Amino acid sequence: MAGKSPEEQHPVKAYGWAATDSSGILSPFKFSRRATGDHDVRVKILYAGVCHSDLQSARNDMGCFTYPLVPGFETVGTATEVGSKVTKVKVGDKVAVGIMVGSCGKCDECVNDRECYCPEVITSYGRIDHDGTPTYGGFSSETVANEKFVFCFPEKLPMAAGAPLLNAGVSVYSAMRFYGLDKPGMHLGVVGLGGLGHLAVKFAKAFGVKVTVISTSTSKKGEAINDLGADAFLVSTDAEQMQAGSGTLDGILDTVPVVHPIEALLGLLKNHTKLVLVGATMGSFELPILPLGVGRKSVVSTIGGSTKETQEMLDFAAEHDITASVEIIPMDYVNTAMERIEKGDVRYRFVIDIGNTLTPPES
């Protein structure tokens, strides 16, 4: 008799919402999770952030996912079971799971605390885990992960407003830290005022950095300055404003998740500085070489953050009262939320109330 598949051997029944084809429409879905291993933490999911990457992944815009796919990179809940060798978490603790649940643990990236760049990184959904089964994300009743990829969620942080820190938060935090854009007194430009952009402003201000928000939308000026504490605002389609800002920035974080012109942005940079593209932008940018060369400017990119950076970011956020500005939604609103994300109709992040609104499928 043929042996059971690894997935059939999973004893823990779970449920969530999954995309089953490239329409990206999510619907109720039953599946199973593995038993809690010696180094694992089982998490009852209470809140899950919804990000632009979830929309792209559900539709398989990147061409690298299979179905069914349960999204969710920003997961917060409580530990319900811990393995015998787990040391940093106990049952009942507030915990979080971000964009990764595994890596090889042996390569140069892993041994230097850069697991998100491991060639064998296992993301929280849409990948194959070490046991040969697909990973399913946070739009679900529970999850289980190796304790290395489970984070202690500070008591001071509210769960719902803190959930987006697990992807959006660490993405901008890691970019600022790694590229040295976190020094007090620096002048940083933040392009885009969405999920990543609004958190970039909050972290930058906590670092003591002067912030200019750059947007195509004049209506966001009040939000940027009055609500988020930015120091200045530039309309990127206003040639006079952009000229006035020429050569004033020590760096730029570009958080816009779609391809857009960047030549005018390069003009805002001082010489010998960089524009950092943050996040999983699809497509290719047109890169003007001469404006880069004459000022020795750089265009670089980053995505996500390591486990070490993620825990540091959560602790820093708790210390400085940094949370996302969120709209809390029920599970069955998720498809409408995805549509609104594509239209830019959210201030600034959707978070699903998993604990109170996710119910088991009827059949």
UniProtKB/Swiss-Prot annotation:
| NADP as UniProt keyword | yes
Question: Keywords assigned by UniProt?
Answer: Alkaloid metabolism, Cytoplasm, Metal-binding, NADP, Oxidoreductase, Zinc
Keyword Plastid carried by entry: no
Parts of the chain that traverse the membrane = none
Q: Which Pfam families match?
A: ADH_N, ADH_zinc_N
Recount how this protein's activity depends on pH: Optimum pH is 6.
Tissue specificity: Mainly expressed in mature roots and, to a lower extent, in stems and leaves.
Taking the first listed entry, what is the main subcellular location of this protein, grouped into a coarse class?
A: cytoplasm
Q: Give this protein's Gene Ontology molecular function annotations.
A: oxidoreductase activity, acting on the CH-OH group of donors, NAD or NADP as acceptor
UniProt-listed SUPFAM superfamilies: GroES-like, NAD(P)-binding Rossmann-fold domains
For this protein, the Enzyme Commission number is: 1.3.1.73, 1.5.1.-
Q: Where in the cell is it found?
A: Cytoplasm
What temperature-related properties of activity are listed for this protein? Optimum temperature is 37 degrees Celsius.
Q: Which SMART domains match?
A: PKS_ER (SM00829)
Residues annotated as binding Zn(2+) 2 = 104, 107, 110, 118
List the catalysed reactions.
Answer: 17-O-acetylnorajmaline + NADP(+) = (2R)-1,2-dihydrovomilenine + NADPH + 2 H(+); (20S)-19,20-dihydrovomilenine + NADP(+) = vomilenine + NADPH + H(+)
Pathway annotation: Alkaloid biosynthesis; ajmaline biosynthesis
UniProt record similarity statement: Belongs to the zinc-containing alcohol dehydrogenase family. Class-P subfamily.
State the oligomer form and interacting partners: Homodimer.
Q: What is this protein called?
A: 1,2-Dihydrovomilenine reductase
**UniProt lineage:** Eukaryota, Viridiplantae, Streptophyta, Embryophyta, Tracheophyta
